[in-house]
Amino acid sequence: MADEKPKEGVKTENNDHINLKVAGQDGSVAQFKIRRHTPLSKLMKAYCERQGLSIRQIRFRVDGQPINETHTPAQLELEDEDTIDVLQQQTGGVY
């Protein structure tokens, strides 16, 4: 009889962390490891620090949909190796 339980220390498919890619408009890609239930604000702030950007200057999107700081990867149904796009906020209009 085979024992179906995973051995201690061996990673399983249902681990608590996922790896996410954050793609900038300039083609750069940064990778982050984050817990599935951690608010994305942690990832957003870390990305801004790495890139020297203000969080007020950029917007984060998944599959074209805006995300905010309170969302978690689990809420957005993000999977391992999914990509979050970063766009610079554009201000414009008629003078």
From Swiss-Prot:
Q: Which GO terms describe its biological process?
A: protein sumoylation
Pro-sequence residue ranges: 94-95
Ubiquitin-like domain: residues covered? 17-95
User: One GO molecular-function annotation for this sequence?
Assistant: protein tag activity
The source's superkingdom equals Eukaryota
Please give the Gene3D superfamilies that the UniProt record associates with this protein. Phosphatidylinositol 3-kinase Catalytic Subunit, Chain A, domain 1
* Ranges that cross the membrane: none
Question: Could you tell me which SMART domains the record lists for this protein?
Answer: UBQ
Q: Crosslinked positions for Glycyl lysine isopeptide (Gly-Lys) (interchain with K-? in acceptor proteins)?
A: 93
- Keyword line: Isopeptide bond, Ubl conjugation pathway
Task: Kindly list the GO CC terms recorded for this protein.
Answer: nucleus
Similarity section: Belongs to the ubiquitin family. SUMO subfamily.
Q: What does this protein do?
A: Ubiquitin-like protein which can be covalently attached to target lysines as a monomer. Does not seem to be involved in protein degradation and may modulate protein subcellular localization, stability or activity. Upon oxidative stress, conjugates to various anti-oxidant enzymes, chaperones, and stress defense proteins. May also conjugate to NFKBIA, TFAP2A and FOS, negatively regulating their transcriptional activity, and to NR3C1, positively regulating its transcriptional activity.
Q: What is this protein called?
A: Small ubiquitin-related modifier 4
- Specify the species: Sus scrofa (Pig)
> Source gene?
SUMO4
